[in-house]
From Swiss-Prot:
<protein>
    <recommendedName>
        <fullName>Uncharacterized transmembrane protein DDB_G0281147</fullName>
    </recommendedName>
</protein>
<keyword id="KW-1133">Transmembrane helix</keyword>
<feature type="transmembrane region" description="Helical">
    <location>
        <begin position="52"/>
        <end position="72"/>
    </location>
</feature>
<dbReference type="GO" id="GO:0016020">
    <property type="term" value="C:membrane"/>
</dbReference>
<keyword id="KW-0472">Membrane</keyword>
<keyword id="KW-0812">Transmembrane</keyword>
<feature type="transmembrane region" description="Helical">
    <location>
        <begin position="88"/>
        <end position="108"/>
    </location>
</feature>
Length: 119
């Protein structure tokens, strides 16, 4: 195939060969893939781990739930969620304990008073 054949849009097989102007820009098909940069934030990971541990320990003891308030202003949503859940569960637990204590105080005093009246 010669330059004249190309200019005349003919090749050896008689098929049309398109001509392109030199000023035409064609898209580049090179691989421009950039891997996603993952920055591990150790501080946030520690906050989440600490928050989860305190949340789980709160079921055994009440104190870890109130200690978990340290993560309530965390930028990490998961740490903040566990912290809020811990504070809510701590409040509910204290309310239930107070109700039971008041109930038992009334129960004991009423039993004590009824026992006195029986004498």
């Amino acid at each position: 195939m010669t330059l004249d054949d190309i200019e005349n849009n003919n090749n050896d097989h008689g098929q049309f060969m398109p001509m392109y102007d030199e000023g035409v820009n064609f898209p580049s098909y090179s691989n421009n893939f950039q891997p996603l940069k993952i920055e591990k934030n150790d501080k946030e990971d520690r906050q989440v781990t600490c928050s989860i541990v305190l949340f789980v320990l709160g079921f055994l003891l009440l104190i870890p739930w109130i200690i978990n308030v340290i993560n309530i202003k965390s930028k990490n949503k998961m740490a903040r969620g566990f912290s809020i859940a811990s504070v809510v569960l701590f409040s509910l637990s204290i309310a239930i304990i107070v109700i039971f204590v008041i109930f038992f105080i009334f129960l004991i005093t009423s039993l004590h008073n009824s026992h006195r009246e029986d004498r």
